[in-house]
């Protein structure tokens, strides 16, 4: 029985990974459409509006175009690196996003399957729950720098190599500020576990300082009210990590040469594009999780929502599923807002020069992140006296 349950859990976790990856890939065309319509709205034009209602079928036309383009490889390219780079571009985003809790767990009661009794079972609405979720996500996301170098070196083109070196230097530079910006959050909540961080942000704002409990019922208990500087630094560094404007020095979409993926076209280019949106999704998901309560509803604790659902649903399993559905919708509303901010900023701010980009990362954001970490540690120590 124990072996069967282990196989069952491995199968369920494998299926969840596949489903989350498919959700990410399927979300990309919708985000592309939203970006096109959003940029048109910002620039006072129409955007895609000819193919289908509101231009929605344009997504299918683009997919067919990418799949039917000629597959070629430059003579000077290194075949393994050239073909492996777009594949590996998808992996960090999908694997890292799978570790983010998208909703509260669903409690499944006992049930019969394959002639055996199974359960009770706690179904996590995430690919996998590991105790050091933050470290895992940052570690996997950082592998994207290798993808850039693989594409630049494997293309056998000096311009793609220079673009890859610039892009990887940018990514590595801002990873320092990105990592330090959330050290304050880790110290504040005292855990690396993402679910525990989410649950720590339930209800209205309340904290203890020098033996006194301070409450503000008109504010949600979100991390941004404890770490406003960390939130600003994290979100700014996330733009640089995902190579989005105003930090798109890796490619420069308005220029003739596309940086590290100059020699890629068709579906191979599209895979890099999906990878970029994957990093945007990770950044938006982590922003929601660290600083905006994750899947929790503002002012409402999980226990209060469970109590309400128990009075509405006929069984405990249905009540748990209802709570998970509500939390999933809440997470996606917050998540969608930050995805829109990525689009909004791209079509609003101009691009930095490369020297400005490096100065901002090393001379401004890194010192501020260090100062925020030191001050947070000092305040937590004083509050504990």
Swiss-Prot record:
Protein family: Belongs to the complex I subunit 1 family.
Cysteine disulfide links: none
Keyword Transmembrane helix: yes
InterPro entries recorded: NADH_UbQ_OxRdtase_su1/FPO (IPR001694), NADH_UbQ_OxRdtase_su1_CS (IPR018086)
EC number in record: 7.1.1.-
Chemical reaction(s) catalysed: a quinone + NADH + 5 H(+)(in) = a quinol + NAD(+) + 4 H(+)(out)
Alphabetical list of Pfam families matching this protein: NADHdh
Gene: nuoH
KW Oxidoreductase (keyword) present: no
Record localization: Cell inner membrane
Biological process according to GO: aerobic respiration
GO cellular component terms, semicolon-separated: plasma membrane
Membrane topology: Multi-pass membrane protein
Gene Ontology terms for molecular function: NADH dehydrogenase activity; oxidoreductase activity, acting on NAD(P)H, quinone or similar compound as acceptor; quinone binding
Keywords, alphabetical: Cell inner membrane, Cell membrane, Membrane, NAD, Quinone, Translocase, Transmembrane, Transmembrane helix, Ubiquinone
Class in the EC hierarchy, top level: translocase
Protein name as it appears in the record: NADH-quinone oxidoreductase subunit H
Main location: membrane
Regions crossing the membrane: 14-34, 80-100, 130-150, 172-192, 219-239, 280-300, 325-345, 365-385
Record function comment: NDH-1 shuttles electrons from NADH, via FMN and iron-sulfur (Fe-S) centers, to quinones in the respiratory chain. The immediate electron acceptor for the enzyme in this species is believed to be ubiquinone. Couples the redox reaction to proton translocation (for every two electrons transferred, four hydrogen ions are translocated across the cytoplasmic membrane), and thus conserves the redox energy in a proton gradient. This subunit may bind ubiquinone.
Binding partners and assembly: NDH-1 is composed of 14 different subunits. Subunits NuoA, H, J, K, L, M, N constitute the membrane sector of the complex.
């Amino acid at each position: 029985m124990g072996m069967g349950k282990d196989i069952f859990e491995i199968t369920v976790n494998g299926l969840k990974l596949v489903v989350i990856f498919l959700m990410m890939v399927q979300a990309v065309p919708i985000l592309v459409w939203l970006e096109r319509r959003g940029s048109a709205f910002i620039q006072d034009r129409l955007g895609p509006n000819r193919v289908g209602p509101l231009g929605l079928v344009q997504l299918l036309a683009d997919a067919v175009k990418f799949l039917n383009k000629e597959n070629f490889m430059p003579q000077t390219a290194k075949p393994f690196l050239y073909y492996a780079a777009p594949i590996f571009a998808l992996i960090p985003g999908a694997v890292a996003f799978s570790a983010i809790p998208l909703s509260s767990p669903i409690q499944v009661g006992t049930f019969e399957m394959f002639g055996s009794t199974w359960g009770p079972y706690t179904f996590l609405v995430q690919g996998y729950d590991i105790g050091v979720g933050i470290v895992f996500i940052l570690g996997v996301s950082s592998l994207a720098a290798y993808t850039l170098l693989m594409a630049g070196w494997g293309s056998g083109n000096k311009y793609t190599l220079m673009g890859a070196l610039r892009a990887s230097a940018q990514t590595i530079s801002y990873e320092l500020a990105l990592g330090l910006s959330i050290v304050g959050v880790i110290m504040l909540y005292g855990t690396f576990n993402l679910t525990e961080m989410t649950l720590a942000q339930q209800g209205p704002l309340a904290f203890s300082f020098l033996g006194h409990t301070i409450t503000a019922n008109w504010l949600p208990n979100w991390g941004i009210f404890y770490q406003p500087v960390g939130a600003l630094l994290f979100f700014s560094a996330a733009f640089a990590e995902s190579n989005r404007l105003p930090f798109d020095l890796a490619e420069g979409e308005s220029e003739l040469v596309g940086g590290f993926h100059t020699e890629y076209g068709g579906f191979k280019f599209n895979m890099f594009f999906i990878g970029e949106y994957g990093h945007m999704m990770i950044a938006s998901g982590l922003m929601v999780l660290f600083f905006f309560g994750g899947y929790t509803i503002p002012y409402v604790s999980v226990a209060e929502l469970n109590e309400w659902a128990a009075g509405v649903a006929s069984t405990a399993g249905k009540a748990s599923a209802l709570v998970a559905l509500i939390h999933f919708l809440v997470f996606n509303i917050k998540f969608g807002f930050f995805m829109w901010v990525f689009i909004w900023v791209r079509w609003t701010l101009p691009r930095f020069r490369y020297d400005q980009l490096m100065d901002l990362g090393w001379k401004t954001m890194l010192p501020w992140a260090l100062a925020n970490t030191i001050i947070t540690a000092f305040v937590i120590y004083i509050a504990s006296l």
